[in-house]
């Protein structure tokens, strides 16, 4: 168990100064270097006279300088706001408007003109590192102080900045490094692929730094180039893979992504979107002895609140994989519309309470009041997810409440439709989306389909292909759930965080 993230990092800087903490395409940085660089930058930040505990925006990608900057800010008592350098300009501006940062540290080239906020660019940061200024940690982030603020991808209005405190982070980290479901290896060698602006990144950097391991970063330029991606992955000595299931699906396109090529890759941790039986089965075939962990949780509850190691029995018997056993320190309940707890087996909204729950959204009391509340004397959060609990304490996912529609009198879970579409022998991936009429009622269901390789060659027309898919699914899908229109694509759009962009497709359909 750790009690202070900075003290833990400092401990490893003293006891294993020459051990690698960060490796980005062979450029290696040690724990000793991380201490020297973050000390020097923390001293410089202190000299700027910023408002105490004010948030600082950090802009960039997967560079080592990002990690060193985060550590420096934590030492100097400031929360950091990670913003990915591939973000849309409107999003960056919206985050600036909401967050009102006291400083911008730009590891990538900052794309906006800013008059009223000082900026440190990467050349200045590098020069500060070279100064090697000693630093005594006296006012680091602690307790309920904000450790980081991550902005969600809000589809309407301004994005919301989720405030995660040092206590929140400790609740998550100590659970992950001690939980038998994860079984994190000693001194883990972890893949660092999800961008720092996505809280899934905390699932790789927090346990790695807490246990003195090494992060192996994958820059976006590599991730976006299939040839480079597969060549790079095959050379990385990572034990632990942390990503969305969608990114794993991308990796599975390479026949070399298997235990023979990557014998040291023994752990897969998934969060951020639903892990399907189909993806888990493919992974089990490629990595028969690997530990595949399905985790679940909203950003507002610090990365994840439940996790389970997927068994062969689950892969054989479950239509939908369980999302885990919940954290001991975080009471998790399923409630009805009146807020009453439901018995095991009954479906309702999942709520989480306890020390992992955020204090709310930065500078947004209205949205905070809508989502955060007190439940049985504890801070709690409405997840907006449907679920149920088994008698064995396993949490089952039932879909998003906002992805639940009413069509021809039937209540339909869009995720259920998508899950069934993905079971067709012809389908590689699929998503169901509703089209609304001018009265905002569902007019029909559409399916976006990516076909398996070679399938299109077997059919002259899309109509014949659609008939074949419907025939394939007739025994597992009710007629009222079957989409009336099938749209065939080479790929499905992803959000900047690597999830399938369902809401973007819904917007496209309903222009």
UniProtKB/Swiss-Prot annotation:
Source organism, top-level taxon:
Bacteria
Record's GO cellular component, any one? cytoplasm
Task: Tell me which EC number(s) this protein carries.
Answer: 6.2.1.54
State the CDD domains in the record: DltA
Indicate where this protein is primarily found.
cytoplasm
| One BP term from GO | lipoteichoic acid biosynthetic process
Binding, D-alanine: 199, 303, 499
Q: In which pathway does it act?
A: Cell wall biogenesis; lipoteichoic acid biosynthesis
Keywords recorded for this protein, A-Z: ATP-binding, Cytoplasm, Ligase, Nucleotide-binding
User: Subcellular localization, per the record?
Assistant: Cytoplasm
Query: Where along this sequence does the record place binding of ATP?
Result: 152-153, 294-299, 385, 397-400, 499
For this protein, what reaction is catalysed? Answer: holo-[D-alanyl-carrier protein] + D-alanine + ATP = D-alanyl-[D-alanyl-carrier protein] + AMP + diphosphate
According to the UniProt entry, its GO molecular function terms are: ATP binding; D-alanine [D-alanyl carrier protein] ligase activity
Return the broad EC class: ligase
What family, per the record? Belongs to the ATP-dependent AMP-binding enzyme family. DltA subfamily.
Biological role stated in the UniProt entry: Catalyzes the first step in the D-alanylation of lipoteichoic acid (LTA), the activation of D-alanine and its transfer onto the D-alanyl carrier protein (Dcp) DltC. In an ATP-dependent two-step reaction, forms a high energy D-alanyl-AMP intermediate, followed by transfer of the D-alanyl residue as a thiol ester to the phosphopantheinyl prosthetic group of the Dcp. D-alanylation of LTA plays an important role in modulating the properties of the cell wall in Gram-positive bacteria, influencing the net charge of the cell wall.
What is the protein name for this chain?
Answer: D-alanine--D-alanyl carrier protein ligase
Source organism of the structure: Streptococcus agalactiae serotype III (strain NEM316)
Q: Which gene encodes it?
A: dltA
């Amino acid at each position: 168990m750790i009690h202070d993230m900075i003290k833990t990092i400092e401990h490893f800087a003293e006891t294993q100064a020459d051990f690698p903490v960060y490796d980005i395409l062979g450029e290696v940085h040690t724990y000793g270097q991380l201490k020297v660089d973050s000390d020097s930058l923390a001293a410089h930040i202190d000299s700027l006279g910023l408002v105490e505990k004010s948030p600082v925006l950090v802009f960039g990608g997967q560079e080592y300088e990002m990690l060193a900057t985060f550590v420096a800010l934590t030492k100097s008592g400031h929360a950091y706001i990670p913003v990915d350098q591939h973000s849309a300009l409107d999003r960056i501006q919206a985050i600036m408007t909401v967050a009102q940062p006291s400083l911008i540290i730009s590891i990538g080239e900052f794309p906006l003109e800013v008059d009223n906020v000082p900026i440190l660019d990467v050349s200045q940061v590098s020069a500060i590192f070279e100064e090697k200024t000693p630093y005594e940690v006296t006012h680091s982030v602690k307790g309920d102080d904000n450790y980081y603020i991550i902005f969600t991808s809000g589809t309407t209005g301004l994005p919301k900045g989720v405030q995660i405190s040092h206590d929140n982070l400790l609740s998550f980290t100590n659970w992950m490094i001690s939980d038998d479901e994860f079984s994190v290896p000693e001194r883990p060698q972890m893949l660092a692929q999800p961008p720092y602006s996505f809280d899934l990144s905390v699932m790789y950097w927090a346990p790695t730094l807490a246990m003195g391991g090494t992060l192996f970063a994958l820059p976006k330029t590599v991730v976006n180039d299939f040839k480079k991606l597969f060549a790079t992955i095959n050379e990385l000595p990572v034990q632990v893979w942390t990503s969305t299931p969608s990114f794993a699906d991308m990796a599975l396109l390479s026949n070399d992504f298997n235990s023979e090529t990557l014998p040291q890759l023994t752990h897969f941790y998934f969060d951020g979107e639903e892990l399907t039986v189909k993806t888990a089965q493919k992974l089990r075939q490629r990595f028969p002895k690997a530990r595949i962990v399905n985790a679940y949780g909203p950003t507002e509850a610090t990365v994840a609140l439940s996790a389970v190691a997927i068994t062969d029995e689950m892969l054989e018997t479950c239509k939908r994989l369980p999302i885990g056993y919940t954290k001991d320190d975080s009471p998790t309940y399923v409630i009805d519309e009146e807020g009453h707890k439901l018995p095991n087996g009954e479906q309702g909204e999942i709520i989480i309470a306890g020390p992992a729950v955020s204090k709310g959204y930065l500078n947004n009391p209205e949205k905070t009041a809508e989502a955060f509340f007190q439940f049985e004397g504890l801070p709690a959060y409405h997840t907006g997810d449907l679920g149920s609990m088994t008698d064995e304490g396993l949490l089952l996912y039932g879909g998003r409440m906002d992805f639940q529609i009413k069509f021809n009198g039937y209540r339909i879970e869009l995720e259920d439709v998508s899950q069934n579409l993905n079971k067709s022998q012809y389908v590689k991936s699929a998503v169901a989306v509703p089209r609304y009429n001018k009265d905002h009622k569902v007019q029909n269901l559409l399916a976006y389909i990516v076909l398996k390789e070679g399938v299109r060659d077997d059919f002259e027309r899309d109509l014949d292909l659609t008939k074949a898919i419907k025939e394939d699914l007739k025994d597992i899908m009710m007629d009222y759930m079957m989409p009336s229109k099938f749209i065939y694509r080479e790929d499905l759009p992803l959000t900047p965080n690597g999830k399938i962009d369902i809401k973007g497709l819904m917007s496209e359909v309903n222009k």
